């Protein structure tokens, strides 16, 4: 999940880079300018260096060009032109975390865990997610050819996907049985919390609600505040999630609004390996608060918060600044939410669990055992 902040105005910590390290950078920069097989401008090299610093930190930190930033805004609003996939890394290549419901990716048969080896003949090895987005996005109706590696397949194969407008409602609901409702949340957009509220109120208008199944399988997350708003439908106030990081600005608590809509009504939350980020926030909160039974398979394990820091009028840094914690103090980073009831094949589609990509599989995944949250400091990140 990403939030937009202004750069802090506090005095930054002293730079400890040695002369030798700076000289290494300068020598490398000069060697590339002089000897690389193709001409590369100084501006291009500096941009590559910034990208490299960020992408080497973890899978979610990134350098955002104007197009990247526009893409980020589009994804939170719920409409963009592309393939309809959430991506990460596996083995140095771009991989599909989950395809979005109703997207061209679903129509083309792409699956969670598929590794994208090439995009229109260009290898994705070492390619950043921002670069891959540039290759995969394009005008509606145009096509892109992906070379796919899939578990269980002996050879890579090509999949042709026709780009389309991804404008899928994030919330759908239907009555399963007399008074028992399924609410399917495919991603967390700005209005998703309010959409769930509307779905519940609509169900109540039809009669008694005896139980709710909240389905966040294959939901990659999105806007954190939407998950907090959504939790307010099932909790009568109290803590939903809190965040901690190195900087005081990263220490925040998020509470549900009082006045839940379904007091005493049983709730089941369905999760699987494609449930990430905001999906894990609501599942973890309802689990810790004793408000729902979590059912399915272990979730993805993305427990980090990214802050968008503008560095110019058109460019920004997306930097991992904190981890989020469930009401009982659990960090799910690389661990995921473990269901109360494990149902191995409780899946939205016929995906095999073994093909799933999880946060722990992503390159430079933040290992919880290596993270030390120090005493709050007044220095910016």
How does the language model describe each region?
Residues 10-61:
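N-terminal activation segment of mature serine protease catalytic domains
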Residues 48, 60-98:
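PDZ/PDZ-like peptide-tail recognition elements
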């Amino acid at each position: 999940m990403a939030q937009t902040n202004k750069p802090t105005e506090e005095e930054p910590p002293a730079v400890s880079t040695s002369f030798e390290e700076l000289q290494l950078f300068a020598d490398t920069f000069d060697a590339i300018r002089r000897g690389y097989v193709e001409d590369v401008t100084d501006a291009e090299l500096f941009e590559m260096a910034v990208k490299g610093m960020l992408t080497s930190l973890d899978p979610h930190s990134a350098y955002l060009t104007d197009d990247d930033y526009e893409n980020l805004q589009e994804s939170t609003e719920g409409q963009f032109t592309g393939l309809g996939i959430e991506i990460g890394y596996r083995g140095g290549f771009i991989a599909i975390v989950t395809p979005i419901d109703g997207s061209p990716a679903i129509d083309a048969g792409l699956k969670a865990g598929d590794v994208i080896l090439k995009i229109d003949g260009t290898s994705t090895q070492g390619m950043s997610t921002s670069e891959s987005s540039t290759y995969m996005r394009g005008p509606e109706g145009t096509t892109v050819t992906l070379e796919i590696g899939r578990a269980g397949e002996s050879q890579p194969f090509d999949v042709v996907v026709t780009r389309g407008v991804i404008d899928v409602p994030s919330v759908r609901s239907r009555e399963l049985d007399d008074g028992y409702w399924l609410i399917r949340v495919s991603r967390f957009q700005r209005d998703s919390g309010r959409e769930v509220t509307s779905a519940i109120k609509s169900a109540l208008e039809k009669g008694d609600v005896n139980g709710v199944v909240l389905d966040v399988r294959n939901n990659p997350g999105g806007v954190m505040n939407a998950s907090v708003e959504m939790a307010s439908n099932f909790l009568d106030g109290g803590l939903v999630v809190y965040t901690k990081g190195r900087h005081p600005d990263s220490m925040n608590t998020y509470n549900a609004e009082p006045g839940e809509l379904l007091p005493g009504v049983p709730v089941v939350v369905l999760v699987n390996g494609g449930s990430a980020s905001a999906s894990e926030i609501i599942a973890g909160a309802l689990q810790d608060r004793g408000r729902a039974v979590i059912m399915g398979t272990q979730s993805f394990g993305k427990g980090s918060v990214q802050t968008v820091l503008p560095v110019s009028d058109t460019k920004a840094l997306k930097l991992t600044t904190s981890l989020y914690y469930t009401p009982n103090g659990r960090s799910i980073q690389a661990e995921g939410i473990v269901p109360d009831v494990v149902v191995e094949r409780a899946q939205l589609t016929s995906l095999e669990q073994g093909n799933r990509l999880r946060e722990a599989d992503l390159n430079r995944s933040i290992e919880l055992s290596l993270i030390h949250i120090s005493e709050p400091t007044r220095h910016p990140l």
